[in-house]
């Protein structure tokens, strides 16, 4: 099972323009993407965009601000 923690670690070191394609490649290359996985990837991308934009919002365990 893919967790938000697994995805975020990978997203953290990937450069901003490349990270979306690389995260999707990491999962699409090894297994079919489930709805849960797509949702997880979307949440990771949202977190990274908030971080990149300097948002000081509080991020909960669910990944929502």
Swiss-Prot record:
Tagged with keyword Repeat: no
Transmembrane segments: 22-44
Transmembrane keyword on record: yes
GO cellular component, one term: membrane
Location of the protein in the cell: Host cytoplasmic vesicle membrane
Alphabetically ordered keywords of this record: Host cytoplasmic vesicle, Host membrane, Membrane, Transmembrane
Main localization category: host cell
Residue ranges of coiled coil: none
Region (Important for viral replication in intestinal cells): 13-18
Record's bilayer topology term: Single-pass membrane protein
Purpose of the protein: Facilitates virus release from intestinal cells in vitro, possibly through the host autophagic pathway.
Protein name: ORF2p protein
């Amino acid at each position: 099972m893919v967790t938000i923690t697994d995805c975020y670690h990978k997203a953290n070191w990937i450069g901003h323009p490349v990270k979306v394609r690389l995260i999707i490649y990491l999962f699409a290359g090894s297994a079919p993407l489930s709805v849960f996985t797509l949702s997880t990837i979307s949440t990771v991308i949202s977190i990274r965009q908030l971080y990149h934009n300097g948002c000081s919002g509080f991020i909960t365990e669910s990944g929502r601000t």
